[in-house]
Amino acid sequence: MLRFAPSPTGDMRTEQLRIAIFNYIVAKQKEVNFIVRIEDTDKERNITGKDTEILQILEKFAITHDSVFHQSEHLNIHQTLAIRLLEEGKAFVCTCTPEAPESDKTPSRYNGKCFNVDKEELKRLKEEKIPFVIRLKKPEHDMIIHDLYKGETVTSADEVDSFVILRADATPTENFASACDDMLSGIDFIIRSEEHLDETAKQEYVKKQLGYEEETTYAHLPVILNEEGQKMDEKDDAFTVKWLFEEGYIPDAIANYLISLGNTTPTDIFTLPEAIEWFNITKLSGSPVKFNIEELRLLNRKHLEKMDDKRLSSLFGFADADIGKLAKLYINEAATINELDARIKAIFSPKDFDGKWGEQMRMLEKIIAEAPMFATFEAFESHLMKESGLSGEYFSKPLRVLLTGAEQGPELSDIYPYIKSYLLEVAS
């Protein structure tokens, strides 16, 4: 079983979406369940509504899940497992302040002050309401983790240390909650960012101390870099999926690009369902990959070009295949929904009759309003020229502005078939 485990602490990052896609693909390939676990145990950082946004984004990409739950729903289970470790002598109560463990010469290591707190002392702490945490006793041996990309990694017992598993407010730490939930859900394949590699030894140790013996396959993906070769962060436009949507990039293109990053694909243009047929998680590059917005623009253009005409028209508020075909006439100069939408809006918006060609435009507007519908542009153009007496650029330029709202663009003979039934609205 595989899982995607985001935290509702901000907008979904582009890198997180890539991880979700890979987990979903591998789950489909293995014909096992794929679950979404909202890791909301850090109450102070949670942002209301972000969990819903995450699920809505997954839905836009047709990433379906077999179940979804919030980690906070398992609070009682986490507490019970922590108490069990305490009772088995595998964990201990600690009353040290956050600063106390840092008082020795190795601030990142726990100093062992509370190793020998007994049951009587624990009873006193509860009665006197003295805050305490529960720590897992550090391992006796180094932890060895096997990763698809990093190979064998060794984490010393000192690095794992005696870490906190239950906070003073009785909520679990992220490492403890994640390990417990992975164990309870039977997660045996974990695909996530290499930023979590250092946490893996602790999470494996938790499962081991709880008696869980099932093997877990790990694939810690390299981070995504910006075009300057630095790790992407909030300063980078493409850091969040929300920004990509706002800029007019569509799910098919985004998924196509994220799957292609650091990968050799059999074809440049593909959909998520198609990728499931050939994707190989072991073939991804183990090195960081750069995000190139121009490459995404190219893919977005290609996917818009392939999109069903009527569906494309719906992105601009229509339900007419002709409007989709009209939009595709602009595909060479527009790569996003926003850019295409601007062209369509220019065609259907009221025109400016106060500009250079205003007088001629008013003349043509009146003729069009009184003219019959012509099947071809040639017949339409001939009628307008005859009735207006205009010719040359005094005819062609005002006609183009009247019909498209712009002085340049595709041939009017190509545009006309798709707007002829809207002429009274367009030419006004």
Swiss-Prot record:
A motif ('HIGH' region) lies at residues 6-16. It comes from the Bacteria. Keywords: Aminoacyl-tRNA synthetase, ATP-binding, Cytoplasm, Ligase, Nucleotide-binding, Protein biosynthesis. It holds the Pfam family tRNA-synt_1c. The keyword Cell membrane does not apply. GO terms for cellular component: cytosol. GO terms for molecular function: ATP binding; glutamate-tRNA ligase activity; tRNA binding. The keyword ATP-binding applies. InterPro entries: aa-tRNA-synth_I_codon-bd_sub2, aa_tRNA-synth_I_cd-bd_sf, Glu-tRNA-ligase_bac/mito, Glu/Gln-tRNA-synth, Glu/Gln-tRNA-synth_Ib_cat-dom, GluQ/Sye, Rossmann-like_a/b/a_fold. It is an enzyme of class 6 (ligase). Its EC number is 6.1.1.17. GO terms for biological process: glutamyl-tRNA aminoacylation. It catalyses: tRNA(Glu) + L-glutamate + ATP = L-glutamyl-tRNA(Glu) + AMP + diphosphate. Coiled coil: none annotated. Catalyzes the attachment of glutamate to tRNA(Glu) in a two-step reaction: glutamate is first activated by ATP to form Glu-AMP and then transferred to the acceptor end of tRNA(Glu). Belongs to the class-I aminoacyl-tRNA synthetase family. Glutamate--tRNA ligase type 1 subfamily. PANTHER family: GLUTAMATE--TRNA LIGASE, GLUTAMATE--TRNA LIGASE, MITOCHONDRIAL-RELATED. Monomer. This is Glutamate--tRNA ligase 2. The lineage of its organism: Bacteria, Pseudomonadati, Campylobacterota, Epsilonproteobacteria, Campylobacterales. The gene is gltX2.
